[in-house]
């Protein structure tokens, strides 16, 4: 990774703020499980007390975005009504009840008598999180950071500025009632700060971008700090010859329409040729009723899909009520298409043939591979993680929805009684390498 000349040096003010967050994060990392649980409950209570102000602030952002012609997909993400806010608060309370991710002993090994090695989970340090039009992300990320013992520098899109400010004030007010320093989380407010954040190696340990393909790729190309995220969410649903048509339609509708602006919504529907006529006879009117615009290949157009899909469509993340449709000859045809166009986020198969389903689950190299269920389940909250900071499509861990376990690293601790390597090199001592109970 190289840093672009267009990325400014951090200002003295930003360096000072980042140093304050890092100092608070060091103390946070030493806090105990109970202190961090209480902090999250206090944050949830503060959000509830401030819910009226937060929703009102969001209305201001929505009105401004509407007058500026913000895209429908971004408008959907920007909206934070009372129901959505209450869900985020409930997620925060559930997060407080999850097991402590810190201090877990992953390895316990005797190297020799009185020479014992441990591997213990510890916080990463400070997270730098950049996101667009997702004010509920402030709640998710700040709460995950506190629960996992990490500080966080947050930069939301300008379109959500009023909402983000109202949320961060409530969260800090909640923390002020606890033993956790509110300075562990901070909100950046300008584009210059978000760009300069990319140069804070040494103060920030991980960058997490949540937003458009362009945003994620820009960040990946312009920082030396490790980046966790995905640049696209091109998800596929394959309907096998052995699919139950009613179930297939239900899953397809949910995977596309339940929240089309989500990165785990499907963008391409692949249909086995043997069921394509009967399935599309049911699906075309159902998708029309759901206001989904279908774009098809020549085979699906011959079966009633009205518009043509271009080569570009197969590689497009619509984030809208648009769905590409393709008829494939068999499972291998579906797998070939997925290999070529998938962003390795989430793919699903609908089939009552267990052997076919197992092959799909084994072969598809995506972060999530599902059988007979909606791709919309690819979510940290639905996985029981409490919340997520984002979804990683990289092969190295963490992968998929990243919750608490993805926000910790580990440290090796070795306790001895004066042992030196020379004694093992000359053969005076021998390693036992005996695993001990965790």
Curated annotation (Swiss-Prot):
Gene Ontology molecular functions: glutamate-5-semialdehyde dehydrogenase activity; NADP binding
Major site of localization recorded for this protein: cytoplasm
SUPFAM superfamilies: ALDH-like
Protein name stated in the entry: Gamma-glutamyl phosphate reductase
Cellular component terms (Gene Ontology): cytoplasm
Entry EC no(s): 1.2.1.41
Record pathway: Amino-acid biosynthesis; L-proline biosynthesis; L-glutamate 5-semialdehyde from L-glutamate: step 2/2
Gene transcribed to yield this protein: proA
Gene3D superfamilies: Aldehyde Dehydrogenase, Chain A, domain 1, Aldehyde Dehydrogenase, Chain A, domain 2
